[in-house]
Amino acid sequence: MSEAITSARATARFVRVSPMKARRVIDLVRGKSVEEALAILKYAPQAASEPVAKVVASAAANAENNFGLDRRSLVVSEAFADEGPTMRRFSPRAQGRAFQIRKRTSHITIVVESQKEGAK
């Protein structure tokens, strides 16, 4: 039990962003420091960057408050978006038809790890 905890995670579930679009944004921040990741996400034009930024900030806060890790040494070690449940909606079309619209959701998970100052 002498091993110190060096990682923290945060998850946002049922986010109304398609997993494919969320993964585009997540790929930008994987492996970056938390400060750098938040700076990238702040100016990313994609709509998915806002919920991803919230999860990165939450993971950093979890590391800081729950495990006493230094925010400046945190790196996004793991980041992924899994598919959540799909909401099905119907769009009325001509001549009494109805087409199905799939509104996809994502479960976004970010893991941050404390890295030594000399590493990298």
From Swiss-Prot:
Gene3D superfamilies: Ribosomal protein L22/L17. GO terms for molecular function: rRNA binding; structural constituent of ribosome. Pfam families: Ribosomal_L22 (PF00237). GO terms for biological process: translation. It comes from the Bacteria. Keywords: Ribonucleoprotein, Ribosomal protein, RNA-binding, rRNA-binding. Part of the 50S ribosomal subunit. This protein binds specifically to 23S rRNA; its binding is stimulated by other ribosomal proteins, e.g. L4, L17, and L20. It is important during the early stages of 50S assembly. It makes multiple contacts with different domains of the 23S rRNA in the assembled 50S subunit and ribosome. The globular domain of the protein is located near the polypeptide exit tunnel on the outside of the subunit, while an extended beta-hairpin is found that lines the wall of the exit tunnel in the center of the 70S ribosome. PANTHER family: CHLOROPLAST 50S RIBOSOMAL PROTEIN L22-RELATED, LARGE RIBOSOMAL SUBUNIT PROTEIN UL22M. Belongs to the universal ribosomal protein uL22 family. This is Large ribosomal subunit protein uL22. It comes from Corynebacterium diphtheriae (strain ATCC 700971 / NCTC 13129 / Biotype gravis).
